């Protein structure tokens, strides 16, 4: 697989979601958690979604329980939390693993394409962000300390390239 849109992921209801449906759009993929110090970033992600979705931005939330068990809920609990607490309307998909032998293939591809600090592949923590351009290639990887609004200029640049 050579670009993000070659992959298929799972929706919260277990159905398959081909990323090809967003071919030609800019994608921001984020591993999320409901009980994390970075959880308030849902608010910034939703703000980006509302501002840029009509211009070609897709935000995909990937719940993950690999970091200190901070996403223990089932799909219904996660959806309810996101909706009621942060009024999230961007797609929040099925819970996945982002590291190790059980890692979702999309995350294996993204971490190979864009390494972290000191060249590491592993996702460091919840709310690591991967910005993917209209060509399906990873543009930027950001750690959890980078707030969603800090990506605005990169998003605007990526949206302009198409």
Give a label for each model feature:
Residues 1-162:
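Chalcogenol-based redox active-site neighborhoods
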């Amino acid at each position: 697989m050579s670009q993000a849109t070659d992959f298929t992921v799972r929706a919260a209801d277990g159905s398959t979601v081909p990323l090809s449906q967003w071919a030609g759009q800019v994608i921001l993929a984020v591993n999320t958690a409901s009980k994390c110090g970075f959880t308030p970033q849902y608010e910034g992600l939703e703000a980006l979604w509302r501002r840029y979705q009509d211009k070609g931005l897709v935000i995909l939330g990937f719940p993950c329980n690999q970091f200190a068990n901070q996403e223990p809920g089932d799909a219904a609990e996660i959806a309810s939390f996101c909706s009621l607490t942060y009024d999230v309307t961007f797609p929040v998909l099925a819970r996945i693993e982002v590291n190790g032998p059980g890692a979702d293939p999309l995350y294996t591809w993204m971490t190979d394409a864009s390494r972290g600090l000191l060249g590491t592949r592993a996702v460091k923590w919840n709310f690591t962000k991967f910005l993917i351009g209209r060509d399906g290639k990873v543009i930027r990887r950001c750690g959890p300390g980078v707030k969603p609004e800090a990506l605005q200029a990169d998003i605007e640049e990526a949206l302009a390239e198409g």
